[in-house]
């Protein structure tokens, strides 16, 4: 009996302990939900945040003063960090909220005038002339306004494309082919202009042929050691690497090749090239632990000890979106299914390394890419996950600050908070992601997501 009594006491104690543990786990779950801003998503609250920013930007003199004097990394004429980003946000807001913001938008466009008159340094999408053209084209009212200046920009870009790419000695470097600085970004702008400028179509095809030449060359997309951006990369990749990102890697040219076909622009052997290029991305050595590398060491000696963040610049989110574009362009159900499986794998992770709400490597791009993909797949579990990401983003919102969302990065183990306005790393990218989240309209029209080659 004593033994039986002891067993009963032990079992009862274990039961109590289990209940305590369950209660503890429940409390931890509540705390976790609290930590990510677990509030019921109220679309009206999101709209209020967006409308407050519209009101702020509509007071042009005050907004300009605060932005120019308090924003870090402000670069006035660039799409990534300047006035073109404001123009894109207001243009998108005008369509979603059915507001007449034409006069406000025009005032910000006028601020670009002095820079255009004195000459823009470079032709790139994120920091050059095509970025200004991109913003003006999106803001153009049914393609009637700003056409004169757009035609001038188009002509300069077309001339640049032919002059630059007629050089047979071109080296394979991200600054030549990527979205940020290279021809993937310029090509995406030209794709938006093909209906209004025949030469834009010719220049775009020239870019696609350039990509095709790289792909079938001896070293194809290998970026040599001397063309690595950072000294640490020169150490890690002595014989070079293949960049597998969307911002600086092969996903940019591949996405543009797919998008061009989807829009009826093809070069000789386009479909075969797109198939081969997509197959190249799927090489098994480009993956580690079922995730794509950000950069593949050609010597296969360097294996990073970190997990790649699933934002825009790198990560499986970009891989997923690019494969979806290729699948649609080629009408290939296998690629589409693969994209779907990657999407499910992404949402099964916690993605807690996305510490910043901003776009480049943060939650805003994570939300936008997954939300865009789920418009096609329409998976309920993805919709639930998207709501969780929105809550995380909203938890970073500051009502008191002139900058509603800050960019966050780690530096020597400490979180560093920076006030930035621009689309790429600042609050505008976050606000555009939230605007896209609440937008229920058909977005087959040209839109800001084109600049990231998400669409």
From Swiss-Prot:
Protein role: Involved in the post-translational modification of the lantibiotic epidermin.
UniProt record, GO biological process: peptide modification
Annotated keywords: Plasmid
Record organism: Staphylococcus epidermidis
Keyword ATP-binding on entry: no
Entry keyword annotation includes Glycosyltransferase: no
Protein name per UniProt: Epidermin biosynthesis protein EpiC
Entry similarity comment: To B.subtilis SpaC and L.lactis NisC.
Record-linked Gene3D superfamilies: 1.50.10.20
Transmembrane segments: none
InterPro entries: Epidermin_biosynth_EpiC (IPR020406), LanC (IPR033889), LANC-like (IPR007822)
